[in-house]
Amino acid sequence: MIPERLEFSGIKQTKFDCVFSMGLLYHQRNPQEHLQNLKDFLKSDGQMIIETIIAPDSYGMALEPVDRYASMPNVHLVHTDLGCKSMFEDLKLDLVSESDSVPTSHLEQRKTKWMPFKSFESALNQDNQSLTIEGYPAPSRKFYLLEPKF
């Protein structure tokens, strides 16, 4: 496992059986490039596992937050399921399997003695927990298992 940014890893010629992108897609200024870079690290029979937050399909391809999303300043696009699948198709990635969409829980991201700052709970509208404090739909997570079409 190499838990570091691909562009800084110095392993450009290495091919892997499996690559993971866990909670990174929505932080990318160019998510297609991120996925293409991951694909480039796969063996021809390799697999890619993507975990990301998704927006409701009513947003079309993606929700593009102004300034912040759920208190996070570095969220550029929150794709819908349709938007993710369209990107996968454009990049010639076969969708092998997918999870259901599951709302993010305050139990996953909470204050602890090691992280005593604001938590996920503080990023939600206190009067309506289905919305972020910015008024966007609260995050839901989804996993995708992909294989390259070479």
Residue ranges with predicted function:
Residues 16-31:
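A short SAM/SAH-binding and catalytic strip from SAM-dependent methyltransferases
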Residues 128-150:
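C-terminal lobe and adjacent flexible extensions of AdoMet/dcAdoMet transferase-like proteins
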Residues 53-75:
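Short, glycine-/aromatic-enriched active-site segment of Class I SAM-dependent methyltransferases
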Residues 32-47:
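A short glycine-rich, Lys/Arg-flanked "PGG" loop and its adjoining helix->strand segment in the class I
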Residues 1-3, 48:
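Hydrophobic/aromatic anchor residues within beta-strands of the central parallel beta-sheet
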Residues 7-19:
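A short acidic, Gly/Pro-enriched loop at the edge of an enzyme's catalytic core
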Residues 94-123:
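Conserved catalytic loop of SAM-dependent methyltransferase domains
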Residues 75-98:
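Short alpha-helix
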